[in-house]
């Protein structure tokens, strides 16, 4: 499963 972790990361 490839989840967009970079998008979920709080910048």
Swiss-Prot record:
<protein>
    <recommendedName>
        <fullName>Phycobilisome rod-core linker polypeptide CpcG3</fullName>
    </recommendedName>
</protein>
<comment type="similarity">
    <text>Belongs to the phycobilisome linker protein family.</text>
</comment>
<comment type="subunit">
    <text>The phycobilisome is a hemidiscoidal structure that is composed of two distinct substructures: a core complex and a number of rods radiating from the core.</text>
</comment>
<keyword id="KW-0605">Phycobilisome</keyword>
<keyword id="KW-0602">Photosynthesis</keyword>
<comment type="function">
    <text>Linker polypeptides determine the state of aggregation and the location of the disk-shaped phycobiliprotein units within the phycobilisome and modulate their spectroscopic properties in order to mediate a directed and optimal energy transfer.</text>
</comment>
<keyword id="KW-0793">Thylakoid</keyword>
<dbReference type="GO" id="GO:0015979">
    <property type="term" value="P:photosynthesis"/>
</dbReference>
<comment type="function">
    <text>Rod-core linker protein required for attachment of phycocyanin to allophycocyanin in cores of phycobilisomes.</text>
</comment>
<keyword id="KW-0472">Membrane</keyword>
<dbReference type="GO" id="GO:0030089">
    <property type="term" value="C:phycobilisome"/>
</dbReference>
<keyword id="KW-0042">Antenna complex</keyword>
<dbReference type="GO" id="GO:0031676">
    <property type="term" value="C:plasma membrane-derived thylakoid membrane"/>
</dbReference>
């Amino acid at each position: 499963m490839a989840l967009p972790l970079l998008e979920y990361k709080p910048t």
